[in-house]
């Protein structure tokens, strides 16, 4: 008989006598705040996980069991709020991006969700992808291998787009963002060090002092 004990989304322990099906492994959830100047009181399933969830903040991984989970935020400066439901599968890592967009009533808070479901990197390879949550238009991006000749274009690079994972050799890689049809560098993000079997997401964000900034989100280890 198994008697799993769930500690409010943060841990899973079980007493196991060796019979019955294996308990769910759970998934890892991270949230990234991409709205300059905004801050929220962030809760997952009613439990406050960050009382000052502000621009550029990436939460530590939160373990969630398969099923529906409520993600809530209340602005610390006005009446803005969000209340979303994430349907989590087992053994899948999720990134939820808190962003703003334009709706029928003006600016609204919206979510972007990315997961690492899929086969993962090929044997001996790592994987990289880009999540673009900057509103700067007219840009292109590619990954460049540090000290090598490797270069991998990013196929989807526009506001709220999350590219597919691209397999790359292990090593140090940087994301280079330029204006379309130009050789300038708007953002150089990295280097990002990856070993075989790892997957990483580079999130591109707007920035107050400059046009762009970035955050690195671990996916698979």
What is each of the regions a protein language model found here?
Residues 15-221:
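Intrinsically disordered, low-complexity polar regions and short flexible loop motifs
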């Amino acid at each position: 008989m198994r008697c799993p004990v769930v500690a409010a989304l943060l841990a899973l322990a079980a007493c196991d006598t060796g019979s019955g099906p294996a308990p769910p492994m759970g998934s890892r959830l991270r949230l990234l705040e991409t709205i300059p100047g905004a801050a929220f009181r962030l809760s997952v399933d009613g439990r406050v996980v960050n009382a000052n969830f502000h621009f550029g903040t990436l939460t530590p991984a939160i373990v969630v069991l398969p099923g529906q989970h409520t993600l809530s935020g209340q602005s610390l400066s006005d009446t803005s709020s969000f209340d979303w439901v994430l349907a989590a599968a087992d053994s899948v890592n999720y990134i939820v991006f808190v962003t703003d967009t334009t709706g029928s009533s003006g600016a609204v808070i919206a979510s972007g969700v990315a997961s690492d479901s899929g086969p993962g990197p090929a044997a001996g390879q790592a994987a990289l992808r880009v999540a673009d949550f900057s509103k700067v238009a007219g840009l292109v991006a590619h990954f460049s291998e540090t000290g090598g000749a490797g270069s991998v274009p990013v196929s989807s690079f526009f506001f709220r787009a999350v590219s597919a994972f691209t397999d790359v050799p292990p090593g140090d890689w940087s994301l280079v963002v330029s204006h379309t049809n130009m050789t300038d560098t708007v953002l150089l993000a990295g280097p990002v060090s990856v070993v075989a079997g790892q997957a990483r997401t580079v999130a591109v964000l707007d920035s107050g002092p400059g046009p762009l900034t970035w955050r690195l989100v671990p996916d698979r280890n």
